[in-house]
Amino acid sequence: MNYVNILEKSKNFIELELVNDDHSLSNLIKEVLLSKKGVILASYGVEHPVLDPDTGRYISNPTIMLKTDEKTDAEKVLKEALKDIVDLCNKTLKEL
């Protein structure tokens, strides 16, 4: 089973679904995307979550939407944002 499903994709727009997740990662990705040059819209939506009896977490399948200007490739910006998040996590691990 995939963790990420691409729902729609073009040069300047991408919408993806995170399977069995909550607000945490979606919100982080959105915030980093909003700091990127060429991003017109970065948002996410979460339908009503359900309680996972195994983990005690409320989960859903959040969708992340990214729209860029015509000069900016949406997939490239998304990959840059994800790399920035990984770099931040690695930096934090080194400092602990």
From Swiss-Prot:
Q: Which domain of life is it from?
A: Archaea
**PROSITE patterns (UniProt xref):** RNA_POL_L_13KD
Tell me yes or no: is Heme among this UniProt entry's keywords.
Answer: no
Q: Which InterPro entries match?
A: RBP11-like, RBP11-like_dimer, RNA_pol_Rpb11_13-16kDa_CS, Rpo11-like
What keywords tag this UniProt record? Cytoplasm, DNA-directed RNA polymerase, Nucleotidyltransferase, Transcription, Transferase
Disulfide pairs here are none
Q: Where in the cell is it found?
A: Cytoplasm
Q: Name one Pfam family in it.
A: RNA_pol_L_2
E.C. no: 2.7.7.6
Annotated GO CC locations: cytoplasm; DNA-directed RNA polymerase complex
Enzyme class (EC, first level): transferase
Q: Which reaction does it catalyse?
A: RNA(n) + a ribonucleoside 5'-triphosphate = RNA(n+1) + diphosphate
**A biological-process GO annotation:** DNA-templated transcription
Q: What does this protein do?
A: DNA-dependent RNA polymerase (RNAP) catalyzes the transcription of DNA into RNA using the four ribonucleoside triphosphates as substrates.
> How is this protein organized at the quaternary level?
Part of the RNA polymerase complex.
Q: Which family does it belong to?
A: Belongs to the archaeal Rpo11/eukaryotic RPB11/RPC19 RNA polymerase subunit family.
Q: What is the name attached to this protein's record?
A: DNA-directed RNA polymerase subunit Rpo11
Look up and give the organism this protein is from.
Methanococcus maripaludis (strain C7 / ATCC BAA-1331)
According to the entry, what is the taxonomic lineage of the organism? Archaea, Methanobacteriati, Methanobacteriota, Methanomada group, Methanococci
